[in-house]
Amino acid sequence: MYLQRWLFSTNAKDIAILYFIFSTFCGLAGTAMSFIIRMELSAPGQQYLQGQNQLFNVLVTGHTILMVFFLVMPMLIGGFGNYYLPLMIGASDMSFARLNNISFWTLPPTLICLLTSTMVESGTGTGWTVYPPLSSIQSHSGASVDLAIFSLHLTTISSLLGTINFIVTALNMRTNGMTLHKMPLFTWSILITAVMLLMSLPVLSAGVTMLLMDRNFNTSFFEVQGGGDPILYQHLFWFFGHPEVYIMIVPTFGMMSHIVSTYSKKPVFGEISMIYTMGSISLLGFLVWSHHMYVVGLDTDTRAYFTSATMIITIPTSIKVFSWLTTIYGGSLRLTTPMLYTLSFLFLFTVGGLTGVVLANTSLDVAFHDTYYVVTHFHYVLSLGAVFSMFAGYYYWSPTVLGLNYNEKLSQIQFWLIFLGTNIIFFPMHFLGINGMPRRIPDYPDTFTGWNLVSSFGSMMTIMSLMLFTYIIYDQLMNGLTNKVNNKSINYMKTPDFIESNNIFLMNTTKSSSIEFMLNSPPTIHSFNTPTIQS
């Protein structure tokens, strides 16, 4: 029965927990790869990889694909999305329960393909972009790139199946009276993300399928000798790749809105505008892909358009940031662990956005392209944006998932460790990038030694914070205080005080604006056997 529950589950909550476990494992593997990269770069010359430069690039590729496709997307969309989207709209489960199951179980074979690709021949040393001609049969002759492409195909299938499920559930299974404008912001963020996935993933599939054909069936889509063009691949990849960045960050916008609202004890400022800004960010995300390609020989008019369009994205993003700040302003602020992560997300996401504005300029990007300035830009947005919001989401919602509370003191120590560690890693990279240190190269001139050493020290701090985080989870599961009295949930995060005053147990409650905190914790398998009604 136990195996049957987890292998054949059609319950969204169980599948979400499987996603959490799987993505945590992949995240730790990706972190281990990044740690090896940072140790190799801690000093000039050969360090730990003993001059195996191909292995360095294999680690870079593995780290990126693991973090993007196996940590951020499965956790934010598959984990938090599966668990909380049905709860927030008053649905008993996802619309297609069996589809949900297969969309998860497509992922483990995908991971096996990816990890195998690193061990076949000399591994996939192409970076996550898999650009030809580096990824073509002349440069990577073995089966490694083919396995990586199969891995991308399978993860695309998994994401598309989940996407269909989320869209249908959000549009068709809302409770009575819940119009789209009354739908919670996190649900909106998952819906918008799902639409973006549906639009962008087929383009990636087309690109890597053509690459597979070039490698194995002698076609010439990207082979110059046969009349093909490798730049076409870059256009196809980045038409997926740029929306992908927003696919990773938009769910975090929804989570941040909930957490800011809860710990400020105020409704989110401008809730409708928050929905429209998410929509406009996702739409604009499809119109700016060539800003990744300023140095491939685009003409001046094209580059002028992409510079302007990229800068326009900062407008809806700024509206979101200032709306969060306005929500906090004048609120009854409680600096719990989730709120600390959220505040640091606001600050660090803004820093990452500002470096993005710099890179949007063609003239500057020509200088900064493929340097560590680009690396630190997207890590500030993703590593210190998306990942911090995952921690925030865990600390915010795990008491409702497990029915057990975590150790607040330890979790705040863990926050400060990872906050300092990640900033010590990535802030010095601005200076390295401005001075022209190139990406994906395992060696560098002596002049870059100082900041690289600082950066590698930050990596050690981050590893320590993750060790502490695993202990916090262990402590929560073993010793966490339950939120129940006489078998009734008295979860200290109860109903929203700006909607109603329902403080039955006279506790110092934290308020939330959505329905998931009004249920038992952990919630029952079908939380709403009787349909709820939205007032």
Curated annotation (Swiss-Prot):
Where along the chain is Fe(II)-heme a bound?
H63, H379
Relate the protein's function as given in its record: Component of the cytochrome c oxidase, the last enzyme in the mitochondrial electron transport chain which drives oxidative phosphorylation. The respiratory chain contains 3 multisubunit complexes succinate dehydrogenase (complex II, CII), ubiquinol-cytochrome c oxidoreductase (cytochrome b-c1 complex, complex III, CIII) and cytochrome c oxidase (complex IV, CIV), that cooperate to transfer electrons derived from NADH and succinate to molecular oxygen, creating an electrochemical gradient over the inner membrane that drives transmembrane transport and the ATP synthase.
The record's catalysed reaction(s) read: 4 Fe(II)-[cytochrome c] + O2 + 8 H(+)(in) = 4 Fe(III)-[cytochrome c] + 2 H2O + 4 H(+)(out)
Q: In which pathway does it act?
A: Energy metabolism; oxidative phosphorylation
One Gene Ontology term, aspect cellular component: respiratory chain complex IV
Does Kinase count among this protein's keywords? no
Which UniProt keywords are present, listed alphabetically? Calcium, Copper, Electron transport, Heme, Iron, Magnesium, Membrane, Metal-binding, Mitochondrion, Mitochondrion inner membrane, Respiratory chain, Translocase, Transmembrane, Transmembrane helix, Transport
Protein name, as recorded: Cytochrome c oxidase subunit 1
Gene it is expressed from:
COX1
Principal localization reads mitochondrion
Which sites bind Cu cation?
Answer: H242, H291, H292
Q: What is the scientific name of the source organism? A: Eremothecium gossypii (strain ATCC 10895 / CBS 109.51 / FGSC 9923 / NRRL Y-1056)
Question: Per the record, a Pfam family?
Answer: COX1
